[in-house]
Design a protein with these regions (language model features):
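Hydrophobic ligand-binding cavity/cleft-lining segments
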Residues: 1-44, 144
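Residue-level preference for beta-strand/loop junctions
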Residues: 2, 43-45, 58-60, 84, ...
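Hydrophobic/aromatic beta-strand elements that line small-molecule binding cavities or substrate pockets
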Residues: 6-8, 38, 62-67, 87-94, ...
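A short, structured loop/turn motif at beta-sheet edges
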Residues: 14, 40-45, 67-71, 91-101
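Hydrophobic pocket/interface hotspot
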Residues: 17-21, 27, 49, 66, ...
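Glycine-rich portal/gate segments that line the openings of hydrophobic small-molecule binding cavities
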Residues: 38-79, 133, 137
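Beta-strand/loop substructures that line and gate deep hydrophobic ligand-binding cavities in soluble
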Residues: 78-128
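Short, highly charged C-terminal tails/helix-capping segments
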Residues: 136-144
Length: 144
């Protein structure tokens, strides 16, 4: 089963990075390939959200239920989308009050080979660039 794991050391606090990753409504403003996002349910400890991605004329929507551990972790579980399985999450590890390590880990499997052929490479590129996109977003938002 394909896996993606990316991390970055950033000069921003765990609170700042957690807030950015949890701000699903802002994703289309800065995430490559993200054309829309919606929060379907939200509480202090969980969120269900849908994200629309499009690249090279291929568009897909996937929905995840996210378990929120404030300023530490966001666990993701597939609700709906072109996957048989999608699990993973974000970890925020404090290095100092002004710096942290951000890590994204995803395990996924598409519903069938046709979808994997059409969308697999695109999804891997998009998911692989997410940590960098959030790092650049943090510089825009917090270094102003």
């Amino acid at each position: 089963m394909p896996q993606i794991s990316r991390s970055a050391l950033v000069p921003f606090s765990v609170e700042q990075m957690y807030t950015l990753v949890n701000d699903v409504d802002a994703y289309p403003q800065f995430l490559p390939g993200c054309t829309g996002s919606r929060i379907l349910e939200n509480s202090d400890t969980s969120m269900t959200a849908a994200v629309d991605v499009s690249k090279a004329g291929i568009s897909k929507t996937f929905t995840t239920k996210n378990t929120l551990i404030s300023n530490k972790r966001i666990d993701m579980q597939l609700v709906d989308g072109p996957f048989r399985k999608l699990t993973g999450g974000w970890d925020f590890i404090e290095l100092s009050p002004e710096a942290c390590k951000v890590q994204l880990s995803l395990d996924f499997e598409f519903t069938n080979k046709l979808i994997e052929l059409a969308f697999g490479k695109i999804f891997k590129e998009l998911a692989g660039s997410m940590v960098q996109a959030f790092t650049l977003r943090a510089k825009e938002v917090y270094s102003a």
